[in-house]
């Protein structure tokens, strides 16, 4: 919680966790073909390079404060001095950043033109791990907010809460789709797009939390200028993913060798429901920004909108 209370330390935590994920991929993927493992690590390194560039040039946590040393520094907000908050931010970022690994495997498969189901078998454990960390982070935050009687209770549909829910929903759809693609060889294009979408939403969540463009009860560590850098990285990630898919996607074969009453059909329905839920949350979260951009006034989308659609 102390690292997340200042933007620069939060971004340092982000790149440190990505370095950890990259090291684990390098270690546990030793049995993969060398060219595939190299491509995955190159893509992770490219993401790391972009985040490090933003850290160094816009948000360096190593800037000296001397000679203006404060006589008595401010303590951490008492509400944040809680055991649950020791693990809540790191677990969230483990989930956020972990989405980069399935994205890297997806992009590596597109890069190599290897669009069979093999890459999904390599990617699925990492997607499950990222989903597990993100689930734990959300649960810890909800548990803390519930007994702390703050932040609107265990779930308030706050924009920052939504920023963690959207990649969680996308990753939930992704792990189901990865399993079916691995075992049945279907939904290959859909699985690729979900891999790109899940990581894009994790970057969008980072942007929303740290840019200050939204009004939130999580009002600490906002920086509109540096938020634009995250937005630029988001654009690069989405653009690179869509361009790679456009160049290589034509090689995919459409396979629909399953009946109406089958597990594959149920998975399609499941993914559609999850995707619609994600888009509903995305619309409600971004609508105030869109309205303000078009001079439609200050609009607040709160629990009544989400409760009406979900409950």
What are these regions (language model features)?
Residues 1, 24-37, 52-67, 106, ...:
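Transmembrane alpha-helix boundary signature
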Residues 2-6:
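Short, small-residue-biased leader/transition segments that mark boundaries at the very start
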Residues 8-13, 84-100, 158-167:
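Membrane-interface loop-to-helix entry segments
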Residues 14-30, 101-110, 168-178:
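Central hydrophobic cores of alpha-helical transmembrane segments in multi-pass inner-membrane proteins
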Residues 24-48, 111-132, 157, 180-196, ...:
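Membrane-interfacial loop-to-helix junctions in multi-pass inner-membrane proteins
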Residues 62-70, 94-113, 171-176, 208-216, ...:
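Juxtamembrane interface elements at the cytosolic ends of transmembrane helices
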Residues 141-162, 212-214, 219:
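Interfacial helix-loop-helix junctions of multi-pass membrane proteins
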Residues 159-166, 216-311:
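Contiguous transmembrane helix-bundle modules in multi-pass membrane proteins
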